[in-house]
Amino acid sequence: MKRILLSTLLAATLFPASAHTHGNNPATKLEQATALTPETFRIRDPFVLVDKKKKCYYIITTAQTESRHRALRAYRSTDLEHWYDAGLVYDSSHDALACVDTEQDVWWAPDTYRYKGRYYTFVTSSAEANGIPRFTTALCSDKGPLGPYHAMHDNISQIPLTPDGVQCIDGSLFVDNDGTPWIVYTKEWNGPEVQNKVGEAWAQRLTKKLDGKVGDPIFLFRADEAPWVPGFKDGGHVVDAPFIWRDKQSGRLVMLWSSFTTGDVYAVGQLTSETGTIRGPWKHEPRPVFVNGGHQMLFHDLDGNLKMSLHYDNNDGHLRILDVEIADGILRVTTPSYSSADKSR
């Protein structure tokens, strides 16, 4: 799938590293006077972290430093409408990811979580010069959501949380009812490990510290199982951004993911676990829950309302945060201005 690193371009052009936090110093203040709004915030794969203590929200995006090393940049908001640059929160030049090449290797899809009192950003990368294909790893911050984040191993070969030697992207964190952490990820559709260019979703159990793998991965689903994903004309069924959420009211386990529906339009779909566990089996909903955008996640805002964040559309991605509800285990977009959601159902 064609990906445009808009967040990196934005950081490099509008917010040069020289004007902000250097190295691994934590970002402690808002340094951008003019707020970005959903209409002006050009970003892909936006993941919203809620800070109840400080009553604000963060989005951490990909960026790069003056020395052209991979980095992460944070944005902060108190209302989900106005986003202020909070500076760099990670600089790869200081750790095992220093070998990630700005031109050759990917740097995608940072998802940030609070887990056991620490903050972790799951990010997709690669280290082709070291023979390591695309993978997802976790960076850790002991000091708060604004970092500094750091890799949890000194050796690049120990960094991937997805299976070694397998082309994987878009890992997200899921913690099941007994406290077991999992990384839910995509075995990429154009990688050598899949059949007939059909992407797959898998899950890998992690250590309690999120710094390694435990046991063998488990298969979740294939993209061509979904009725709403016809595949590209020249072949290929995409799985992007698998994200698992437990609905507290129904107790059901739902999974959102992104792919391309009729007309090669990016969209969000849903599955439900028939056992209520990550092992499934997973049942597809026949139609997408959102069309013309994707790489979604769910969160409760500071008032307890359920929201879905994604980029809209897929060609010129901007931040979009939608009101959603889950009724009888099925997610539905309730934002009044979005009529296509109702039409798709």
Residue ranges and their predicted role:
Residues H20-R345:
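Carbohydrate-active catalytic/glycan-binding domains of CAZyme proteins
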Residues I4-T13:
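Sec-dependent N-terminal signal peptides
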